[in-house]
Every structure is written in structure tokens, then in C-alpha cells.
Amino acid sequence: QISYEIDKSIFFITYFFAPLAYVHFFLYLCSELQVMAVESNCIMEFSAQQIAMLLGGKVTGDADRKVSDIGSIENAKEGQLTFLCDAKYINHLPTTNASVVLMTESIDFEGETNATIIRVENARAAMGQLLSLVAKAINPAKQGVEQPSFVSEGVVIPEDAYIGAFAYIGKNVQLGKGVQIYPHTYIGDNVKIGDNTILYSGVKIYYNCAVGKDCILHAGAVIGADGFGFEPDANKVNQKLPQIGNVIIEDDVEIGANTTIARAMMGSTIVRKNAKLDNLVQIGHNVEVGESDFLCAQVGIAGSTKVGAHSIFAGQVGVAGHIELPDNCVFGAQSGVSGNIRKPGMYQGSPAIDAMNWRRSVIGFKNLPDIMSKLQNIEKKLQ
């Protein structure tokens, strides 16, 4: 493994006084050299002041304090960076061994701590920015076509794209700049893949489907398999209804491992931009998932349902077909959504109802044996 020796004094001057745009470029260059990789032999240190400049934060404490790694606030060690975004964890701040703590500026703390604090508007989001840099260093973008792989004649492969071994690229496929197609991936005929999209190993994209820019599809995701469409004939034999539509995944969508999105019977199954789907999610044919929706593991949405934007579906939520849900809804774990929802809000239970009413109902159900016993006693007295 090649190690890169960096003159720390030159780096400090360059980084500390450079404009923010140049800082981003320099960090990108560092990631390309893989000097930031956690498992590398060459570990780069950053001061609290440098991190604050990058994130637009304000330093309290020793601005020259150095960090070269990341840890949780409970278990962090000297030389590590951590973050605090929720006041309920404030009790860890006086005792943490972390050298630097990113803290949401709205959290009130007047106590003492050995850590240097960087106050930012949103510590979780700021930590995300830093983790993005580390992630690019740990798993940098690749280029080139590995063999054996199959690319259909006439498919144009951008110079900065990567196609892993045993990948299959069908006819008339359009690949955007910087796409990353990992080994054992299947891309059917007439598929479009947008710029900088990542398809991890084992992703399957059926014919005529489209994936936008800056998307991430994790291992085993299946896009465009036939929707579950059948019709019994006069003899009650299930006859298949051909699914001739497609799937459209818009920009900045992330799809978890082993999630399946069925192709439309006619038209398109659509996942709107910035939606995030967890592992093991099932999306039926002709469904529309709204912009910036969160779908947690084992959510299932039946065919032709339209989901509004900015909604959250907790684990194992089931949604019936041919219904409409508005924007800004939250459905608690294991809820069963059996009909149209008219207004935004929090819903729970099966069938899903207003979450507050559901909590009252649960309390009533829990007390039902006692209530029945009291009613029986009253009945006996009246006889």
C-alpha cells in the first residue's frame, strides 16, 4: 500500500487560509489519494478550528485540539470527534473522552467538559457532512470495466464510470457520468441510469426502467419485476395480466438491500426524488412514492396507491391498494392503512387511526378485563 507523506505545516497554511471552495477541493483531493482512510497507514489530523471553518461552526475551548477519528459520545477516546444533537444525552458531555464535540447550538450547556466544543446549527447534519468525506475515502469511486463482464454493442461507457466483473449491460442502455456498477449487477435493455448513481452488487434492473442521478441501490434490490397482476377466468384459474409498464426512480433516491419495486401494468411505478427506502421494502405496481418519503424495513404498499410527500412509514406498515395518502403523514410501526387518509397527521394501529385516539383505545383494551368484571358484578347485583 502506498503511503503519502504530507508536510503538515504546508497543509495547515493551505487549508486554514484557503477559501471554502478550495477547502472542499483539497479535501476531495485528499480522499482521492486515500490519505483519510480509517484503515490507511497514513492518518490525517484536523484541528477543531479547521473543522469549524468547514462547517461554519463556533469553537469553545482549545481551537488547536486535533482529531483523526470518529466515535460515539459515550465511548469516544482522546483524538476522536463526536457529536451531540439531542439534549437528553447532555449528561455524557462532562464525562466524554472525545477531544472535540459537535453540538447543536440550541442545546443549553453551562457545565464543564474537557472536550473542545464546536457549536453548529444542526450537529447531526454537520456530522453527516464529515462522514460523507470519510466514506468517500474509505470506498472511493472506481473507474474502468472489469473482466469478465458483458456490455452490449453500442453502449457508451463514460470515462469515469465503473463496471464490475460479471456485470451484464443490455442493449440501448444509457449510462450517466460517474456511475458505479458493482459486480454481478444486471441491467436490462433500454434502461437509463443517471449521473453518479451507485448500483451495488447483485442489483437487478429490468428492461425499460429508469434510475435518476445521485441514487444509491443496495445489494439485491430488484427494480421492474412484474407487478402482482392476475385475473381468474370462468374456471377460477388465475390468468396472468402482462405488466408492460416500467419503473421510474427520480434523482437522489436510496433503495435498501433486497427491496423490490414492481413494474407497472401500464404506465409507471414512480419513486419521487429524495425518497429513502430501507431494506426489504415491497412497492407494488403503479404505486407512486412521494418526494422525500421515508419507508422503513418491511413496509409494503399495494398496487396503484399514491403516497404524498414528506411522509414516514415505520417498520412493517402495510398499505392497501388503490388509495391515496396526503403529504406529511407519519404511520407508526405495524400500522395497517386500509383506506384513504384525508389529512396530514400521525396514525397508528390496524386499521390505522389518529395516533392519539389509538393510544386511548389501547389503554381501554388493556383495561377491558377489569371493566368486564365490574359490569358482571353490577349485573349480578341487579338480578
Which residues fall in each region the model found?
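Structural signal for interior beta-strand "rungs" in well-ordered beta-sheet cores
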Residues: 83, 144-354
